[in-house]
Regions:
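Long, charge-dense accessory insertions within large macromolecular proteins
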Residues: 1-174
Length: 174
């Protein structure tokens, strides 16, 4: 189910401590659901808004993971984006907000729905420029190379690339 681009990114970053050889929701007691210092730069502040808090969580936007097996790059210095989730990176001032409100930002972002005449938040973090490169073409499309916008209609924009090829990008809600 694709609700919005932020939810799509969260689906890609979801981590569970369950599975074969893993824990269950019942065995995840309070002390096991806490954020450990060793999670910094790997596991984000985002959590499920249910009994799965701490059992199902999310990676940070730029986790210090060095391979597909999940090995941690202990020798790498983390990035600023790697400290929080995608929603944390999008929410202006999240580091200065109440922790409960900051955590709820993730849940709230998953429920956002596009509509006509909405006004985007005027306070930005710059991370919104990264989102287009991380989501599927359902939400955004990155140009294939240098080119020029040659036509804009109500439904799409047309780009003519330097090599002469033409591509059409849909606009708005479909």
């Amino acid at each position: 189910e694709e609700v919005n681009p932020i939810h799509q990114l969260k689906d890609q970053e979801e981590v569970t401590f369950g599975g074969v050889g893993g824990r269950s929701e019942i065995t995840m007691v309070k002390r096991a659901r806490q954020q450990l210092d060793t999670y910094k730069g790997i596991i984000s502040e985002a959590n499920k808004d249910s009994g799965k808090v701490g059992f199902v969580t999310y990676l940070s936007s730029d986790p210090r993971i060095k391979d597909f097996r999940g090995n941690i790059a202990k020798d790498e210095k983390g990035t600023a984006a790697g400290l929080v989730s995608v929603t944390g990176n999008l929410q202006y001032g999240v580091a200065h907000d109440d922790p409960k409100r900051s955590t709820f930002t993730s849940t709230q972002a998953s429920q956002a729905v596009s509509a006509m005449n909405y006004t985007p938040n005027i306070l930005r973090t710059g991370y919104e420029n990264v989102v287009a490169h991380r989501t599927s073409e359902l939400y955004s499309k990155v140009a294939a190379g240098p080119g020029k916008v040659t036509e804009v209609t109500e439904d799409a924009l047309r780009v003519t690339y330097k090599d002469g090829t033409v591509d059409t990008y849909p606009l708005g809600l479909e």
